[in-house]
């Protein structure tokens, strides 16, 4: 699952997997604070995660409980990296969340292949980096940082974090 937030924790964008997993339409998610998808008893962990992000520019392997629209919860593992504008001002983060209840060997194999393909594609794009406009460079930099973080994670170990 993927989402992008601004510097104060408001969701700017998300993928369909994030919306479907939480039981919302995408339009119901955009513009809402991230705390709306976390049960109150997990707000402390989410706040700690935000604090670490503010201090370091990234969060890795942060276990957070997420809450669906129907009230059911699931354990997730959160990874986030900062996004900056062309003047290096913080504008938000790209965040990937793994649903720990879905970490089967088959799912892990799919993720490993996806990460490998993404790394190859980013490597191809990097050859033309100097030709990109500032907005595209910012997008590329954010994606590159995210995939560097994700590929440094041993996703096979995710099964054992439940």
Predicted region positions:
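Core hydrophobic beta-sheet residues of small sensory/regulatory alpha/beta domains
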Residues: 2-5
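Conserved hydrophobic beta-strand signature of PAS-family and PAS-like sensory domains
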Residues: 11-12
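PAS-family sensory/regulatory domains
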Residues: 16, 28-41
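PAS/PAS-like sensory domain cap-loop motif
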Residues: 18-29, 87
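Terminal output helix/cap of sensory domains in signal transduction proteins
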Residues: 41-72
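PAS/PAC sensory module
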Residues: 61-65, 70-79, 84, 94
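PAS-family sensory domains
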Residues: 89-100
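PAS-associated C-terminal cap
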Residues: 98-109
């Amino acid at each position: 699952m993927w989402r992008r937030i601004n510097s104060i924790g408001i969701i700017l964008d998300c993928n369909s997997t994030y919306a479907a997993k939480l039981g919302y339409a995408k339009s119901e998610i955009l513009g809402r604070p991230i705390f709306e998808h976390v049960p109150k008893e997990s707000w402390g962990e989410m706040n700690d995660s935000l604090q670490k992000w503010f201090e370091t520019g990234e969060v890795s392997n942060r276990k957070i409980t997420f809450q669906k629209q129907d009230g059911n919860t699931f354990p997730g593992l959160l990874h986030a990296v900062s996004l900056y504008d062309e003047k290096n001002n913080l504008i938000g983060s790209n965040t990937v969340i793994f649903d720990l209840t879905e970490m089967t060997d088959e799912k892990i194999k799919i993720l490993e292949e996806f990460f490998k393909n993404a790394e190859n594609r980013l490597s191809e794009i990097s050859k033309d980096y100097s030709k990109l406009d500032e907005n595209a460079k910012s997008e590329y930099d954010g994606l590159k940082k995210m995939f560097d973080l994700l590929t440094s994670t041993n996703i096979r170990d995710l099964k054992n974090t439940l």
